[in-house]
């Protein structure tokens, strides 16, 4: 009865499995159930299988024996032997009751307490978890299979070609008997490439009679994919690369000592493109470009470097790092000395100074004055209503008062020679004689001069009378000039 129920259980499990996936341990367990023959004392635990797929059909029979067997059926298959039953020892195994709905009941503890729901929600192990997709790679980098050259849309083409060429050369040299024919080597390189590199090897007519076929393919890749004319003029291309490396090493600068690793890496990569005999000069140039510790490191390198270490940039970089660590340790000591109390110096040695004035800096203490806040009074003055506050005031109509200077004037009149008024305000301006004299003086270009002397001053002028008619006209002119002066 147990075997028939087990067979139906396995068939039902595979039917309900559907698109789900099993782990390796679950798959091995199901294979054992299908292939191996079960002994009487063998115990198989099916609790690791998914409970949703493991559904057991219970066969209902009319006999009392079948009902009791199906109601108390255990997934741990096996019966104790007669020897074990005689001894009274019973095997301990986990009992799992099967429900009609197909779910398994959680095994009870020894004390009878039911386990919490925490075990049901327990995180699955790595074996039980299923990854529908592969883990994501670093964005921007195209993953290629091991040993296959694929340089389509790659930025580091030269590095990939060099690594691939080294691998092909190693395969050919370690298996010389298998790769004596150039056709075999080309076939190997064709199967070890993909993309545009494979199309180049397949569609190119190679010279199989002379030269190394591997070197021909690599030079062609340098020409086609890197733009370096290695096929026609390999020596000139290498000389050009050396000149560019020398120019870059000359232009390199290190302004911040924290970028020492990046600077060393760039300098070293370009230095190894030049000749080995020129390495000592480039190493001295490298040390002179390093700030703060470059001079001391250069002195140490000249004294300590000997033999092959003269050509080693790594030895120079090691000296630089040692000097840098010394400076860092010194800076840490200086920070600690700031916190050191000088009063403790008398503990080690007695003072040798008696009556000497100690030089100390004057301490300046800045007093912090608290800002005095004025007492806030929540008092608001009542606003008065102003009718014309936002309007232009009206202009007052009426005659404006003329400016009238007060007090006596301190000027002197030209006509009467009296102080206190101008000539146009003189009451004696109607006198024709003085006006005639002033008119004649103006014609001669004379200007009146005010003298500080008191009293009446007289002005004399010499006149020449030619005809009487002229004098009469001059008198009439004098009267007109007086009128003009009055108008002025």
UniProtKB/Swiss-Prot annotation:
Biased segments, Acidic residues type: 80-93, 465-488
Motif (Nuclear localization signal): 121-124
Taxonomy, superkingdom: Viruses
Single GO MF descriptor: zinc ion binding
Compositional bias ranges of the Basic and acidic residues kind: 94-130
Keywords, ordered alphabetically: Capsid protein, Host nucleus, Metal-binding, T=7 icosahedral capsid protein, Viral penetration into host nucleus, Virion, Virus entry into host cell, Zinc, Zinc-finger
Chain positions covered by the region annotation Disordered: 79-142, 464-488
Protein's recorded name: Capsid protein
